[in-house]
Amino acid sequence: MQSGHLLSLLDLDRPAFDSLMADSFRWKAGESQPARGNLRRVATIFDGPAFRTRLAFDAALSNLGVHQVPLQVHLGEREPISDTAAILNGAVDAVVIRTSDHSAVTELAQHSEIPVINAMTDAGHPCEVISEAFTLVEQRGGLDGLHVTFVGEDTNLCRSWCELTTIYDLRVTQVCPPGWELPVTFLDSLHQQRQEQRVAITHDLDAGVAGADVIYTDGWPRSTREPGPERDAFMTIQIDQTTLDRAGAATLLMHCMPVRRGDEVTAAAFDDHRSITLRAKANLGPTHTAIVSHVLNQG
């Protein structure tokens, strides 16, 4: 982790990501043990619901023998973020934060002398994608050469998957209705990181999943829950078993969760043997343990 923080996957280079994968395998196999020494303290800030994220980091901190300091803090509301950072600097060894405002997390990191881990913001979900990438390494033996099709709107998860293309030789295709694409400014920023463009966008579901190693999807926007033009548009990219069959017999399916069966994916497709979503969620513990361990050892 080049900056000490993990705010996005752009903070990782290939050796660091490879190390995270190797450590995740060791933690999953029970081969790693928490380092002995001074007790570490990690503040956790979860703004809003965070069922799986809370469980993952709770398991990680417990595995490492780290004392968790849960805080109810809304950055920038009662005091400048710089003041909050100053207090945290003297009290804990790292901060895990999940909040919608990525700019607030970035500002916290700018004023922090300790590592900050982005547990999810509106701009990225790096820890989640690290865990899902680990699951693909388990299933496919590596990430180079893979084709990931993200079916859905421009979301934090879509962006984090795209950021992974700057580390490995994998391709990402976004499938979405017109008007819901990744912004050009984001794609241009990736192009600056890596000269070869590895992200494509299409509005055709069949074309987007053709030859995909994994189809990944996320929940639809709330505006699609009522009948109307937006729901009609998103129904054209609903994943069903026919979608999986057209993609290929070896194609895997992953979902961020929570899932709304009958919206972004049918119940039959989600429960299909090619769906590895629950397997990926079982990997949240070891991968998040590896993440926190790396950050603390660098911080």
Predicted regions and their residues:
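Rossmann-like adenosine-cofactor binding region
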Residues: H191-A268
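Adenosine-phosphate binding glycine-rich loop
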Residues: A250-T251, C256-G299
